[in-house]
Amino acid sequence: MATNYHDITIAFAGVCQAVSLVQQFAHKGSADREIFANSIKSLLVTQPDSTLAVFDGQLANLKLGLETVQAQMGSPNGKLDTEIGRYWINVLALSQKLNKNPEAKAKLAERLQQIERQLPLYENDIMADQMIANLAAIYSDVISPLGSKIHVLGLQDYLVRPDIQQKIRASLLAGIRAGILWQQVGGTRWQFLFSRRKILNQAQQFYKSI
């Protein structure tokens, strides 16, 4: 079966967008609310009709992720950010560990269902502070025990703040969700060695169409 770089690139852009948000929260203490919301909302899309449907069917919802893919895969306009590279490699590794752990996957699904049930209490706003705190707790309880912790670099003033810690963990959880999607559509780590150009070309095409 032919490798589906269309869907692989969408899913990888989801991972890259999530880890770019992590970096922004850690270094700047903030990130674009709409971009953050696009990543967080993907956590509640459990039965999508297509890969893009996870991100509400809009490539524009992955703009930051597509920019990051281009920079990471060697676009002449982008410079390699090794910090971001370390984050997405670790997120993909953790998502692969999750995929091989049926108990953890079941626990994650159960906790996300709880989030959905709680939404009406917060006027269906997944971005409510308590919702972000609950998503962060899922990352700590379900994902962190799967493997070595992702060491996030940034300004200490931000990293010690509980609200920033929660946004970082919620972003990482969105990255894990995209990492699971990446595996489901045929993503493998070998592709980053042998098919970087194909992923880059696809990301460039997507970006031009936004």
Swiss-Prot record:
Subcellular location field: Cytoplasm; Cell inner membrane
Family: Belongs to the HflD family.
Predominant location: cytoplasm
Organism lineage string: Bacteria, Pseudomonadati, Pseudomonadota, Gammaproteobacteria, Pasteurellales
Membrane topology type: Peripheral membrane protein
Protein name: High frequency lysogenization protein HflD homolog
InterPro entries for this protein: HflD, HflD-like_sf
Signal sequence, start to end: none
Pfam families documented for this protein: DUF489 (PF04356)
Coiled coil: 103-130
GO cellular component: cytoplasm; plasma membrane
Taxonomy, superkingdom: Bacteria
Keywords carried by this UniProt record: Cell inner membrane, Cell membrane, Coiled coil, Cytoplasm, Membrane
